[in-house]
């Protein structure tokens, strides 16, 4: 990697994404400089092995800006003025191009390429970071019309070095895409979670894995999400208007079984449009449900047995029995592997629900 970026990369912003980028680059031998308004964040990230505090008065060949959305344009402009090649990891791209273009000259702007790793967590801060955060995840590279080829190639290689799979996409197209696949799901989770505030505790006692799955991402930092949503308001407003119409249709469909069937079938079909592992086509999967005692070592024993059986787990979920010290583990496997796995687990005395 050093042959195309020199021997240093400066990561500005030592939160979840910035620290994860530092950890990912450090594991492939890149020297990473870290800076942040919070010196505690820098010390924490450095202590985790994500890099070293950036020396005063020195410039790195490549700068990755991982600061809150409102601060990105100014930090990018400052780094471009210092002669660095710069990318940011903000969630919205075209408004940044416009704002940065008002702060720097045309020549400096050629050294800027936006990017957006499609990875994250409902948690924040350097302690939530991981060197593996980007492994196998899409990382959008969003060159604007005057981005230089060298700048685009460099940022693509940086993303690959972090373990990601790169996708080139125009900034406006990116913003429309994330409005649908990221920002809308977050808002739907927020609305569902918000409804729980007024629920009777007896109703909440019936909560299962479904409501946990739907609301998990609603726990994201409200201040950060406010900036993201406002900056992508035009694209998000369009998709929310479509959802508004569909909700009205859904309310009417509750009295029309055939119309309701169509809504539900569209939902099933939509899940098949989401790419599968490593960006490939979605594969047919099935779920195997296993009761696991809530004791130390039991989950590890289950995974060990599945590994010995020779079945690959595509995904998993864990639900807890409200009345007993037992968890229900849902193992998602390839459809053709489900029945053999059920039989093999029962032969090893696991309680399998058919």
Regions found by a protein language model. Give the residues of each.
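Residues in the short beta-alpha loop(s) of Rossmann-like NAD(P)-binding domains
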Residues: 37-38, 90, 319
């Amino acid at each position: 990697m050093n042959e195309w970026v020199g021997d240093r990369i400066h990561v500005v912003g030592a939160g979840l994404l910035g620290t994860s980028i530092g950890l990912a680059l450090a594991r492939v031998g890149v020297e990473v400089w870290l800076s942040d308004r919070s010196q505690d964040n820098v010390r924490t990230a450095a202590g985790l092995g994500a890099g070293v505090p950036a020396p005063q008065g020195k410039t790195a060949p490549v700068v990755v800006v991982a600061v809150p959305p409102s601060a990105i344009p100014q930090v990018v402009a400052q780094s471009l003025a210092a002669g660095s090649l710069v990318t940011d990891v903000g969630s919205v791209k075209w408004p940044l191009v416009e704002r940065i273009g008002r702060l720097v000259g045309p020549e400096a702007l050629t050294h800027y390429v936006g990017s957006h790793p499609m990875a994250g967590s409902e948690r924040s801060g350097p302690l939530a970071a991981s060197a593996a955060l980007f492994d196998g995840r899409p990382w959008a590279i969003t060159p604007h019309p005057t981005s230089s080829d060298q700048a685009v190639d460099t940022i693509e290689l940086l993303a690959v070095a972090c373990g990601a799979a790169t996708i080139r996409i125009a900034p406006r197209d990116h913003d429309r895409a994330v409005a649908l696949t990221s920002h809308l799901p977050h808002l739907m989770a927020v609305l569902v979670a918000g409804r729980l505030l007024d629920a009777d505790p007896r109703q909440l006692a019936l909560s299962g894995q479904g409501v946990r799955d739907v609301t998990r991402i609603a726990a994201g930092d409200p201040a950060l999400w406010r900036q993201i949503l406002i900056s992508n308001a035009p694209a998000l407003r369009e998709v929310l208007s479509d959802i508004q119409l569909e909700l009205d249709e859904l309310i009417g469909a509750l009295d029309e079984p055939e119309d309701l069937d169509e809504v539900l079938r569209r939902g099933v079909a939509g899940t098949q449009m989401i790419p599968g592992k490593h960006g490939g086509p979605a594969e047919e999967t099935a779920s195997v449900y296993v009761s696991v005692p809530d004791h130390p070592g039991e989950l590890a024993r289950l995974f060990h047995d599945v590994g010995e059986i020779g079945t690959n787990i595509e995904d998993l979920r864990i639900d807890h029995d409200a009345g007993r010290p037992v968890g229900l583990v849902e193992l998602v496997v390839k459809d053709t592997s489900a029945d053999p796995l059920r039989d093999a687990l029962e032969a090893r005395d696991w309680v399998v629900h058919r």
